[in-house]
Amino acid sequence: MEGECAAYDWNDFARCLEVIDPLKQGYARASEVVNYLESHDEQRAMRDVLDSGFDEQRARPKSALGAALLFTMPGEPMLYHGQEWGEATPRLTNERNTLHWEETGDDGGKWLLNRYKQLAWLRRRHGALRGQGFSLDASYPDQTSLIYHRWDGTGDELVVAVNFSPAPQTLRVPFPSQGRWSEVFDGETLDVDIQGDYVADIAPSSARVYVKS
């Protein structure tokens, strides 16, 4: 998902819909794919966002959106040291690239680090995020938004609603099964009827992750 499908540069929406599922790219198993937002070979995502004219207050939510995809998409997530708090040191070739560890204590760095911790815990707890079960259940090109479903066949299910747009969006979220669903980040709970739809308000450049209770 790095490069043209990075959360901060979601310009080719149709192309990104094609590559979001590794099984449709010819891979036999999701575990054969390594997803990443940053690596030592490219400029850091936060640096690119800041250089595009965003301030840190708007840049970190974009990084958090990328993290939500990274930990909930099929494939294995890879982190580049520092991205979990929004390190923005410019890439220097053949020189030491400084890490600003003190930023983990700043409000913005602490918030982003906690979001990464939440997502890492979520992936560790839910086998559905580490397995093969994946379906793209809705896409809204005009709103630059999509919704996908993860499952593992044991009853563990998650629904991820993603808004890549810089504006808030109201989306119809199709839940695949009835029961109680809880949103990971704000604790909202929903009682869903059989294949019930729910209308969700999603903030700009953000994701909502629902877990079946």
Question: What label would you give each PLM region?
Answer:
Residues P174-E188:
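Solvent-exposed beta-hairpin/edge-strand motifs
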Residues H40, L119, W181, S205:
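A residue-level signal for conserved active-site and pocket-lining positions in enzyme catalytic cores
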Residues S31, P61-A64, A68, K110-K117, ...:
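A structural signal for well-ordered alpha-helical segments within the folded catalytic domains
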Residues Q83, E102-D107, L190, R208-Y210:
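Carbohydrate-binding surfaces of carbohydrate-active enzymes
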Residues L92-E102:
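Acyl/amide activation-and-transfer machinery of modular secondary-metabolite enzymes
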Residues M1-N94, R124, F134, Y140-L171, ...:
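Conserved alpha/beta catalytic core and glycan-binding cleft of carbohydrate-active enzymes
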Residues D193-S213:
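C-terminal beta-strand-rich structural cap/linker in extracellular carbohydrate-active enzymes
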